[in-house]
Design a protein with these regions (language model features):
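Catalytic core of pol beta-like nucleotidyltransferases
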Residues: 1-19, 31-32, 47-151
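Short hydrophobic/aromatic beta-strand micro-patches
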Residues: 43-45
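Short glycine/proline-enriched turns and hinge-like loops at secondary-structure junctions
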Residues: 35-38
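A structural signal for isolated positions on well-ordered beta-strands in alpha/beta enzyme cores
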Residues: 24, 41, 71-73
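Short gly/ser-rich loop at a beta-strand->alpha-helix junction or flexible surface loop bordering the NTP-binding
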Residues: 21-29
């Protein structure tokens, strides 16, 4: 199914469902980089928030609708748990439904501030990870050069 058809179907699905205040398509489908294994990635703001059961049911309905796997994340969780992903959703995502533009702009602003406020921590974490990886590789290569002598 082509990107335009997926977008049309998703808009038609969410439009009458008042519980969904914000729906954003992101990922490979939003970028137009659809491959056979691509899934449909959506970020939603529902009032009230979806339970796990409701989230799983929604993903199943969307998979049937789009003919491919669907991953749905709740924006309120994404903002705090994964600020880099939330930032990408707001930066590159395609809004499919925005009930209140002011609410969307406030949420975007909160996500961007949180992303920028935590950027230093992500860089620090990345630096520690690379250093640990470098030490591990150095340890592995020295172990290879110190092979036991034949008796």
């Amino acid at each position: 199914m082509r990107r335009e058809e997926i977008i049309r179907r998703l808009k038609a699905y969410f439009e009458p469902r008042e519980r969904f205040r914000i729906v954003i398509l992101f990922g490979s489908v939003a970028r137009g980089d659809i491959k056979r294994e691509s899934d449909v990635d959506l970020a939603v703001l529902a009032e009230p928030a979806l339970s796990l059961r409701e989230l799983l049911r929604l993903m199943g309905e969307l998979e049937d609708l789009c003919g491919r796997r669907a991953d749905v994340v709740q924006l309120q969780d994404l903002c705090e748990d994964k600020p880099a992903v939330a930032f990408e959703v707001t930066r590159e995502g395609i809004p499919l439904k925005i009930v209140d533009r002011e609410e969307w702009l406030r949420l975007r602003e909160r996500i961007w501030h949180h992303y920028l406020d935590t950027e230093y921590l992500r860089r620090l974490n990345w630096r520690y990870f690379k250093e640990a990886l470098r030490r591990r590789r150095a340890g592995a290569s020295s172990a290879l050069t110190q092979q036991p002598q034949a008796a």
